[in-house]
Regions:
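Cell wall/extracellular polymer interaction/catalysis modules
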Residues: 1-103, 111-129
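A conserved hydrophobic position in a structured secondary element of the catalytic/binding core
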Residues: 108
Length: 129
């Protein structure tokens, strides 16, 4: 439950097309569906820290949320290519109403997120100190 330190690549943008029109960005954009989740199941090595179809048998972070936190969300490529169980999953750049600490993610206000989207591309990296 701690934000990892380092320099990391960013993944695609996932967004709620029912709430937000397609943002201006050079990132690949994927609409979030109700059946999307991000696997955080320590018993599921195959899918750990990956996008999955929601399955009640697999522990996951819901991508389709009632709050607006994941209306815009970019997975940060931490523990990503060959994820190690328990090292951390679902480390995201997402929306917040304020700048209070998160459980390991980076959260910014929607207006700031939209500005960032105009500036970043698939080669952009995030530095977390």
């Amino acid at each position: 439950k701690k934000t990892p330190k380092g320099i990391f690549k960013l993944d695609k943008l996932y967004y709620r097309k029912d709430r937000i029109k397609l943002p201006v960005t050079k990132l690949k954009c994927i609409p979030i569906k109700k059946n999307m989740g991000w696997c955080n199941d320590l018993k599921n090595k195959k899918n750990y820290n990956k996008l999955i179809k929601v399955n009640q048998k697999i522990s996951h972070e819901k991508m389709y949320r009632f709050d607006k936190k994941y209306d815009l969300v970019i997975p940060i490529k931490y523990n990503f290519l060959k994820p190690k169980l328990g090292k951390g999953s679902a480390i995201f750049l997402h929306i917040t109403k304020n700048y209070k600490p998160t459980a390991g993610c980076i959260a910014v206000k929607e207006q700031d997120f939209l500005i960032l989207l105009r500036l970043i591309n698939k080669k952009t990296k995030i530095k977390i100190k």
